[in-house]
Regions:
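Short glycine-rich anion-binding loops that position phosphate/pyrophosphate groups of nucleotides
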Residues: 65-66, 130-133, 181
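Short acidic, glycine/serine/threonine-rich loops at helix termini
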Residues: 39-40, 70-74, 111, 137-140, ...
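Single conserved hydrophobic/aromatic residue that forms the stacking wall/gate
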Residues: 1-7, 12, 247
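N-terminal small/polar loop signature for handling phosphorylated ligands or for N-terminal nucleophile
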Residues: 88-145
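Short, glycine/charged-enriched hinge/interface segments at domain edges or termini
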Residues: 8-9, 13-100, 105
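Flexible glycine/proline-rich
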Residues: 21, 144-245
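Short acidic loop-to-helix transition motifs that present clustered carboxylates
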Residues: 34, 103-111, 156-161
Length: 247
């Protein structure tokens, strides 16, 4: 700083030795997910390498005869598979190594083959669709045949038919999150359930809780007693500073 540019009213602060990090205190806690600032801190201490957990490898696919991937012809009664792209983005943000296995048809043999391939090549598996009670919903059945179903159906909407368990194949095992096929249910069950479990599997010591806001709804909200419901809506700031919700 040029002395001529320093005025009498300006506060000039000298850096103090040890003000960023005191001797004897850990620079970073075990289980912390490394962020860009953490890498800079390590570099400032002359540390080029630190022991870390291996990236979690997650395989995922969608199930359904009606699903088409982007670029394929959309036949009558079919829809484009959006869930895989949603899961791809959420898993990438989480820092996982991902294996996109595409769309699997509603066929028990095809589903078993996909489960076995995923189990032998990943730490965890995420599927979307096939966990309800329809005639072509084979995910829960296949989970039971290849391993166990820890739980199926939860007191939450959207996302009630979610299934969770562990499957085995040729000496390998993997946790399996069977998410519903509804796109909103996929995001809700991933964010509130699967994401927390995956972070724990990564070795993260602290899982950040989702931000909570107290808002006033502009319309009546009905829900079944004992069931947690997540509503989509738009938040707006009122003239009095209160936050309101419209769905």
């Amino acid at each position: 700083i040029m002395p001529s540019l320093v005025g009498s009213e300006m506060c000039i602060r000298d850096s103090l030795k040890g003000e960023d990090l005191a001797i004897g205190t850990p620079a970073l806690q075990k289980g912390r997910i490394l962020r860009p600032a953490d890498l800079g801190l390590l570099a400032s201490l002359g540390i080029g390498e630190v022991p870390v957990q291996r990236r979690l490898r997650v395989a995922f696919f969608s199930t359904g005869d009606e699903l088409r991937s982007i670029g394929e012809t959309l036949d009558e009664g079919c829809v484009y598979d959006s869930n895989r792209y949603t899961l791809h983005g959420m898993l990438t943000r989480l820092g996982c190594d991902i294996v996109d296995m595409g769309v699997i048809k509603d066929d028990p043999a095809a589903l078993e083959a996909a489960f076995r391939t995923a189990c032998e090549n990943a730490d965890a598996i995420i599927t979307s669709g096939g966990v309800s009670v329809g005639a072509a919903d084979y995910t829960k059945q296949m989970m039971a045949e290849l391993g166990d179903v820890t739980f199926w159906k939860i007191g939450m909407r959207p996302g009630r038919p979610m299934a969770f368990g562990k499957i085995q194949s040729h000496g390998k095992e993997a946790y399996l999150f069977g998410l519903p096929g509804n796109p909103v249910a996929v995001m809700v069950t991933f964010y509130f359930l699967a994401r927390q479990a995956l972070l724990h599997m990564m070795g993260a010591s602290a899982v950040e809780a989702p931000p909570m806001l107290r808002v006033v709804s502009k319309a009546a909200i009905r829900k079944r007693p004992g069931r947690t419901e997540y509503q989509r809506g738009i938040l707006s700031l009122n003239s009095d500073g209160a936050v309101s919700y419209t769905h």
